[in-house]
Structures are given as structure tokens and as C-alpha cells.
Amino acid sequence: MGTRTLQFEISDSHEKEEDLLHKNHLMQDEIARLRLEIHTIKNQILEKKYLKDIEIIKRKHEDLQKALKQNGEKSTKTIAHYSGQLTALTDENTMLRSKLEKEKQSRQRLTKWNHTIVD
């Protein structure tokens, strides 16, 4: 082999090496870009999932708020109803105690009157 052929092969080999290094850098850049794109897509998918989850939670929260409000209204009505019943029963109890006291007084008067007549 001649010097010229050897120089040509070295030059050709050097060009191939430079070309391969350039292609390697391009592929590494492409891989980095694709990884970033994959990462971005995964984040977008997660974001959509989280947004759906948030909407579901918002709806459940609204439903619970409505149920809580309805339960509060029912409790208020129930308390008002039982308060009315308690007031009515208290009034009736007061009236019956008064009647009982009058009956006791009448009985005592009758007993005294009977003792007065018998004596």
C-alpha cells in the first residue's frame, strides 16, 4: 500500500468517525427530545386524570352539602315538632296537676264536712 492510499484510508476513516459522532449526537438529541415528549404526555395524562378526580370530588362535595342541608332542615322541623309536643304535654301536665290539687282540696272539704256531720 502506498502512502497516498494510507492517507486516503486515514482521511476516510476520520470522516466516517466524524460522521458517526455527528449522527450519535443527533440521535442523543432525538432521544432526549422524545423522552421529554413522553414525560410531557405522561404529565398531561396525569393532569387530565387529576382534573376528572377533582370534578368527581366537587360533585360528591356538593351532594354531601345538599344532604347536610336537608338533614339540618329535617332536624330543625323535628325539633320544632317535638318542642310543640313538649309544650302541649307540659300544659296538659300543669292542667292535670291543677285538677288533682282541686280534687284533693274537695276531698279534704268533704272529709271535714263528713266528720262535722258525724260528730
Curated annotation (Swiss-Prot):
The keyword RNA-binding does not apply. The keyword Coiled coil applies. Keywords: Coiled coil. Residues 15-112 form a coiled coil. Pfam families: CCDC144C. PANTHER family: ANKYRIN REPEAT DOMAIN 36-RELATED, ANKYRIN REPEAT DOMAIN-CONTAINING PROTEIN 36A-RELATED. This is Putative ankyrin repeat domain-containing protein 26-like 1. The gene is ANKRD36BP1.
